[in-house]
Amino acid sequence: MGNKNIKPSKENRLSILSKDKMDSFKRGSWATSSFREKSRATIQRFSSLRREHIKVDHPDKFLELKRGIYKIIQKSSSIDVDKRTKLMSNIKTMMINPFMIEGLMTSLENLDPDNKMSYSSVMILGEFDIINISDNEAAFEFINSLLKSLLLLNTRQLKLLEYSISNDLLYAHINALEYIIKNTFNVPERQLILRGQYLTPIFSDLLKYAGLTIKSNILMWNKQFIKPVSDLYTSMRLLHCVTESYKVIGMG
């Protein structure tokens, strides 16, 4: 009769232990693999939902701003070079005498289409063939939008912009302001480092008079500045639209 109490040999015990470890490893590997797959699927789903949430709740404010400005600029397409030159010449005069802009806006708002004598009070269009331009609704709306954008700025900003136009600095300031907008408009707060072309004295003053604070070379951003920066950017873009033709014939 066989002895049931015979213990397995050392080799058999090692074989059994090895088999048990292998089975445990396989079970553990399967569990780990399954967990990883489920985790990966969960993360992908969360990321997808997060992207959708951001896309819906946080539209690109800069893109929206540019679209609005582009619609205004399109209305200037019928204004020829000579008229743009006269327009810019008169606007530059008013930018260093800002009280004239407010008076002009009042005159424009009170224009009587049936009374041609009333046009004489509109100084900016005195040499601009106002009678013909009044028949061009799109051009008239562009001029109106340009003047309104300038009215939203303060006296110091207007004088700095006039200086920028006269010294061919306007486009550089537009590029610098776009850099700031792209890096700030979609966040509530930020400290943005400014260097080189983004930290020139004139441009720094434009930001300062829009209410922003620059400490050393760091811009202290808060979402409350979106409105004044948008106003500044709009006026700069509309002015540049006029100066493009203004420079072509050597009047800049």
Swiss-Prot record:
| InterPro entries cross-referenced by the UniProt entry | Orthopox_A47
Q: Name one Pfam family in it.
A: Orthopox_A47
**Family of the protein in this entry:** Belongs to the orthopoxvirus A47 protein family.
Protein's UniProt name: Protein A47
User: What taxonomic classification does the UniProt entry list for its organism?
Assistant: Viruses, Varidnaviria, Bamfordvirae, Nucleocytoviricota, Pokkesviricetes
